[in-house]
Amino acid sequence: MDSISSDNTTIISKNKIHNFDLIINSAGLHADYLANKSNLKTRYTSLPFKGKYWKISFGDKNEIPNRLIYPVPNLDQPFLGVHTVYDKDGNFYLGPSSTPVFGREAYRPFRKFNFLEFCALSYKFILKIIFNENNLRNLAISEFKNLFLSSVMKSSNVYFKHKPVKIELSSKVGIRSQMFDKNSKKLFNDFVVIKQNNIIHILNAISPAWTSSFAMAEFICEKYTIKK
């Protein structure tokens, strides 16, 4: 998308013009980018975090924990911490980490690399880490350790009764579209829904489970789209 008209009724994209009566911006990692294209001014800025997972293998299936295990969360941060996860095939994982990343789609190094985005996000992250806003410096240091096998092995001793026979970095990667509140200088831990004329912006929808939630869809429709 190149731009939105000043009256918020027309989208210009790749030399094509699209007229609309209502648009819902729920673009996840790109939601703030689209909001900026519509000239929406907010106190929020995007700080993406990458989540990586470690695949855990045990010598016997009976040694695999039969329930999800979560750490006690840090209430100063909107993250659940590294916890256990299963996939549909029964594989067992530990994760995700929450590492600051300098690109909305930086799932792999230097793929879909955007230099301007890299510079902008690097600048924002570096300043916040230097001044330790919302303990981001401490978070970055602690999460950086989770990129190394030795640290994950140490953590696994707390989670499991039996020692894993193999721990390997999984190809599963996710990027969290986290919003930072410039006024409170904290990572925001709730949805941000803003109605701008006939555009509804849904920011900080950090999880696919949230964006696919019927309850969330019902809330948006009832409060922002249905005329009473």
Would you name each region that the model predicts?
Residues 1-4, 226-228:
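Short alpha-helical "patches" and their helix-cap loops
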Residues 125-228:
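C-terminal catalytic lobe of FAD-dependent flavoproteins
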Residues 42-44, 117-118, 224-226:
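Short, intrinsically disordered/low-complexity patches at protein termini
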Residues 64-127, 144-167, 177-190:
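FAD cofactor-binding and catalytic pocket of flavoenzymes
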Residues 6, 27, 31, 35, ...:
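A sequence-composition feature that detects small, non-aromatic residues
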Residues 3-114:
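Flavin-dependent oxidoreductases
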